[in-house]
Every structure is written in structure tokens, then in C-alpha cells.
């Protein structure tokens, strides 16, 4: 029964993680700081509901650190998504997410108990496949982002007035008033920066559970700590809300009280936050019923596959025989690697 519950939680978590940015992607979302702050309020509301269903267990301040890690990584999600698409973004950061989570458990980083795999060769072989799959993901060249909202004059700063001129060899690019056209080299630089940022974000995501695992591994230090994963959800989500609020305050100060904060983003961001809150709670349930060694590789990689399906069939971020062939091969290799890592333990 516990296996069925764990696998069901993995499935729910993967679908929600892989689909949560779809509502936001359809809107012009700026730099994503406002989006994340609205998401964090919805996440906190979900956390309050979970907290009440668990009988208001003891609050664990250390678990807030995991929420901070996630919020720092997620602060880059919208710019990444707007540059290389939700599918490629999630697949790339899912790779380092999986590797970071593997390293923390395998070597006992940050004071948690190390987990020695029963089949070391299979474990390392799976890790190599995950890394190689991540390399293949980086070779995919997504289409230039195109949304109607991004072209709307209402969404453009006064200094960025646009004309109807069109680049002769790239009809998708609107030419600024001065006539300058983004060069291919410039687009490649943005793409490379987005990939590097995705890799760094994945590391933050990979360490999200470390504080909770540390508490669970040291009952002598935390004798009254919750016994189940859901007992840490509220503490975890408070960390997210506080970090997102700090980033929002810093952004308001930096922009001199002129942040990008469109009212059109409130509904989609609340939806994304609610989906993430439920998905993360499901991940805690999966950890309790399957162990993190099994659930982590699944939930760190499958959402990227689901997001890639959105990119291919809905947003059309990824098209062309070369890209689709690379995507299919990379997904297959990465999933096989993640399965090997999970089975080896």
C-alpha cells in the first residue's frame, strides 16, 4: 500500500511541477521577481492548510533554509523560461538537481547521513547517463520566444518604442526605433547564460531537502521534531515566503519603487504557486513511502519531460527534426540514468 501511495505521489508531483509554469508562460512576466512573490503567497496558503491537517506540529526553523534554497533557485526560473523555454529549462536544471541531490545523499554533505548504494557500478553509471543527458539538452536550440503579450505596446517601456520594421532575415524580430537588430551571437550569448543559470538553479533545488533530512537524521538534537515529511511543509514554505519577500523588497528598492508588477500576472502566479505547493507536499509524501533514494531521481527528472511536451505541442518552443531527435534521445538517456540511480540504492 505504501508503494502505491508513494508512486501516486510521485505521479501527482511530477505532473504539477511540469505544468506549473504554463499559466505564467502565456503572460509577459518581466524579470520574474513579482511572479515569485505572488507564487510564494499561494505556496504559504497551501502550507497553512497542510499544517492544520497535521495538527500544527512543532515549527522547525532549520527547515526554512531548504525553502530559502528553493526560492533563490526559482528566482531565475522566469528569465530562463523566457529565454530557452519551460521544457529545456526544466530539463537542464533537473539534471543538476538530480546530481546535487545524489551527491548530498551519497557523500553525506552538510552533516546528513551518507547513503552507500547497494550496487555502486549501477549508481555511477546512472549518474554518468544523467550528466550526458544534460549535455544533450544543452545542444537543443529552442525557437525564439513569441507571445502576443510580449509584443503589446502596453507592455513596453516608454524608451523602447517599436516600429513596424522587420529584420530581413528573421521575420520574428521586431526592430527597435534605432534600427539595431539582435544578432545571432547576442542570442547565443543569452542562450548560454540561461543554460549556465539553469545549472546553478538546479544545484539550489537539489539541496532543498537537506535541512529536513539533517533534522530527521539527528533525533538526538531534535527529539520533538515531526516524524513525517508533511510535518515540515509549513516551516519549509515559510522559508520560501520570507526569501521571496526579501527579494521583492530588494527589487522595489533597486527599481526606486518602479517594479514590474502587472495585475495580469496575479492569477497565473497564484495558480503556479498553488500547483507547486501541492506538488512539493506530494514529494514529502513520496519520500516517506518510497525513500528519497527512489523518489528523488523520479521527481527531479520527469517534470522536465512533461514540460518538454508542453514546449513541443503547445508553446512550440522546440521544433525541427534535429531538436526533436536530440530531445527524444536526451530524455531517454536521462530517464534511464535516473532509474539506474534509484534502483542502485
From Swiss-Prot:
It is a multi-pass membrane protein. It holds the Pfam family TMEM144. The chain crosses the membrane at residues 3-23, 32-52, 61-81, 84-104, 120-140, 193-213, 233-253, 265-285, 293-313, 324-344. It is found in: Membrane. InterPro entries: Sugar_transport, TMEM144. GO terms for molecular function: carbohydrate transmembrane transporter activity. It comes from the Eukaryota. Its main location: membrane. GO terms for cellular component: membrane. Keywords: Membrane, Transmembrane, Transmembrane helix. Belongs to the TMEM144 family. PANTHER family: TRANSMEMBRANE PROTEIN 144. This is Transmembrane protein 144 homolog.
Amino acid at each position: 500500500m505504501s508503494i502505491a501511495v508513494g508512486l501516486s505521489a510521485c505521479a501527482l508531483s511530477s505532473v504539477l511541477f511540469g505544468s506549473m509554469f504554463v499559466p505564467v508562460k502565456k503572460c509577459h512576466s518581466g524579470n520574474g521577481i513579482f511572479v515569485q512573490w505572488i507564487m510564494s503567497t499561494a505556496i504559504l496558503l497551501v502550507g497553512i492548510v497542510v499544517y492544520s491537517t497535521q495538527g500544527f506540529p512543532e515549527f522547525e526553523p532549520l527547515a526554512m533554509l531548504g525553502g530559502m534554497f528553493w526560492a533563490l533557485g526559482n528566482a531565475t526560473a522566469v528569465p530562463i523560461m523566457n529565454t530557452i523555454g519551460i521544457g529545456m529549462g526544466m530539463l537542464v536544471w533537473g539534471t543538476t538537481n538530480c546530481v546535487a541531490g545524489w551527491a548530498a545523499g551519497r557523500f553525506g554533505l552538510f552533516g546528513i547521513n551518507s547513503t552507500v548504494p547497494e550496487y555502486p557500478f549501477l549508481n555511477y553509471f546512472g549518474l554518468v547517463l544523467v550528466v550526458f543527458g544534460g549535455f544533450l539538452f544543452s545542444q537543443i536550440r529552442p525557437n525564439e520566444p513569441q507571445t502576443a503579450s510580449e509584443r503589446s505596446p502596453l507592455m513596453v517601456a516608454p524608451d523602447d518604442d517599436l516600429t513596424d520594421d522587420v529584420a530581413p532575415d528573421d521575420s520574428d524580430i521586431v526592430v527597435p526605433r534605432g534600427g539595431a537588430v539582435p544578432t545571432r551571437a547576442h542570442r547565443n550569448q543569452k542562450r548560454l547564460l540561461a543554460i549556465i543559470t539553469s545549472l546553478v538553479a538546479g544545484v539550489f533545488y537539489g539541496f532543498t531537502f537537506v535541512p529536513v533530512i539533517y533534522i530527521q537524521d539527528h533525533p538526538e538534537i531534535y527529539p520533538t521534531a515531526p516524524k513525517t515529511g508533511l510535518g515540515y511543509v509549513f516551516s519549509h514554505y515559510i522559508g520560501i515566503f520570507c526569501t521571496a519577500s526579501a527579494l521583492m523588497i530588494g527589487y522595489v528598492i533597486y527599481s526606486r519603487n518602479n517594479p514590474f508588477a502587472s495585475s495580469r500576472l496575479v492569477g497565473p502566479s497564484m495558480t503556479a504557486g498553488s500547483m507547486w505547493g501541492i506538488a512539493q507536499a506530494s514529494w514529502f509524501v513520496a519520500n516517506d513511502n518510497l525513500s528519497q533514494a527512489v523518489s528523488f531521481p523520479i521527481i527531479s527528472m520527469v517534470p522536465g519531460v512533461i514540460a518538454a511536451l508542453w514546449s513541443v505541442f503547445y508553446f512550440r518552443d522546440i521544433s525541427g527534426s534535429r531538436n526533436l531527435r536530440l530531445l527524444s534521445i536526451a530524455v531517454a538517456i536521462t530517464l534511464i540514468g535516473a532509474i539506474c540511480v534509484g534502483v542502485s540504492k
